[in-house]
Structure formats: C-alpha cells, structure tokens
Amino acid sequence: MQNFPPVEWAVSDAPVPYEAALAVMEARARAIREDGAPELVWFLEHPPLYTAGTSARIEDLKDPARFPVFEAGRGGQYTYHGPGQRVAYVMLDVAARGRDVRAFVAHLEAWIIQALAAFNVEGGMRDGRVGVWVDRTEPGGPPREDKIAAIGVRLKRWVSFHGISLNVEPELDHFTGITPCGIADPRYGVTSLADLGRIISMEEADIALKAAFQQVFASPLVRVDPPVTGSVPA
C-alpha cells in the first residue's frame, strides 16, 4: 500500500455552528487546492440540526420547524446532526490519492467499519445504500438493518470536504423529523453504538476512528488546534 504524507487532525470539544464549520471547510479545501495547505480531518459535534444534500426531496423533511435546516451542498439527501454524534469532516487531496471517487467513498465506509470493529460491532456496506449498516434481524423475524453512520462528501477540483457522521449516543428520536437519507422502507432504521449496548465516550470513539483512518488511508494523523472553538445553544 502506498503511504501518504501526514494529515492534520483537529478535535473541537464544544458544539460548532454549522455555518461556521462550512466556511472553514470551504476555505481549507481552497487552500489545499491553491496553496498546497496540509490536508485536514476535523472531529466535532453540531447542535441539533438537519442538512439537505443535493438530492434532498422536500417531502422527506417531515418536521421543518423542529430544528434549523441547512443546505449543505454535499451529495446525498437529508440527515441529522447533533450532540452524541461524531462528525468527521475530511479535507483531502483526492487527486493525489488516485482520482477515483468511488474508491474514495469506499475508503470512507471502510474507515467506519474498521472503527466499529474495535467495539465488536459488525458494520457493512450495502449496494445502493451509501453509509454503514448493521444487521438487526431478530431470530425468526423479517430482515431488518439500521444505519449507524452516514457519508456525504463534495469534491471541488479533486479536494474533498464534508465527510462522515457516526452515531455514538445521539437522541435517535431527533431523526424522526426527516426521512434519513431518503429511505422510507420500514426495514431500514437508524441506530447508534449506545442503542447497540456499547456505552463508550466520544474520546473512545475518537481513538478508534483515528487508528482506523491511519490504516485505511495510509496517512499518520498529527494533532493540531481546532479551526473553530466555542459553544452554541443546544
């Protein structure tokens, strides 16, 4: 496997406003593209909100007054972000990493799957359903799968931004204001590590995500100060 240069890694401890995060991502992606700035992986949480991807359908926003709604500009449909969910925004030079968008998304999925394995959770990829899923089928019952992590990225001149969100211990009821990722089939729901009985801290999730990223993307992570700090109202 080819090894790549170190990637900067930042962790924001307080919830970050979505618009502030979006501005940081766009500025950093532009700096990577135009000035050769270091790549960045940014771990954070948001206050409760919904984001709409480029394929979002208005009928999938079932409760528009519940939380603020933002146009994200990323691929995908509606998703929820909030406390207890680890968001990881990835600003990477995909051109230097092979110029293969499908392979890049597969790497993001593999990153999450490997991190979940640290907690004895078997995640998997599914054809036609981007993200990471876990089998929740009861013995003798009908097939059922729940989504534990979402993926939504955008590339501009081969530099990525947006990224992944892993449900550690969010309020799963907050997902009911949308049709998550546009999937209304009752066989497919949403879950979290806590819902699966894995009660872990965000710091423990970060350790697993860091180790998995370094292996899957073949880049060491170097800790830096977060680009945005400060809390926002929940």
Swiss-Prot record:
GO MF, any single term: lipoyl(octanoyl) transferase activity
SUPFAM superfamilies in alphabetical order: Class II aaRS and biotin synthetases
Catalyzed reactions: octanoyl-[ACP] + L-lysyl-[protein] = N(6)-octanoyl-L-lysyl-[protein] + holo-[ACP] + H(+)
Active site per database record: 181
InterPro entries membership: aa-tRNA-synth_II/BPL/LPL, BPL_LPL_catalytic, Octanoyltransferase, Octanoyltransferase_CS
Chain residues that bind substrate: 74-81, 150-152, 163-165
Any one annotated GO CC term: cytoplasm
Alphabetical list of CDD domains matching this protein: LipB (cd16444)
BPL/LPL catalytic domain boundaries: 35-221
The EC number(s) this enzyme carries: 2.3.1.181
Pathway: Protein modification; protein lipoylation via endogenous pathway; protein N(6)-(lipoyl)lysine from octanoyl-[acyl-carrier-protein]: step 1/2
Site entry (Lowers pKa of active site Cys), positions: 147
Tagged with keyword Transferase: yes
Keyword Repeat: no
Subcellular locations according to the entry: Cytoplasm
One GO term (biological process): protein modification process
Keywords per UniProt: Acyltransferase, Cytoplasm, Transferase
UniProt similarity note: Belongs to the LipB family.
Record PANTHER family: LIPOYLTRANSFERASE 2, MITOCHONDRIAL-RELATED, OCTANOYLTRANSFERASE
Entry function: Catalyzes the transfer of endogenously produced octanoic acid from octanoyl-acyl-carrier-protein onto the lipoyl domains of lipoate-dependent enzymes. Lipoyl-ACP can also act as a substrate although octanoyl-ACP is likely to be the physiological substrate.
Additional detail: In the reaction, the free carboxyl group of octanoic acid is attached via an amide linkage to the epsilon-amino group of a specific lysine residue of lipoyl domains of lipoate-dependent enzymes.
Protein name: Octanoyltransferase
Organism, scientific name: Hyphomonas neptunium (strain ATCC 15444)
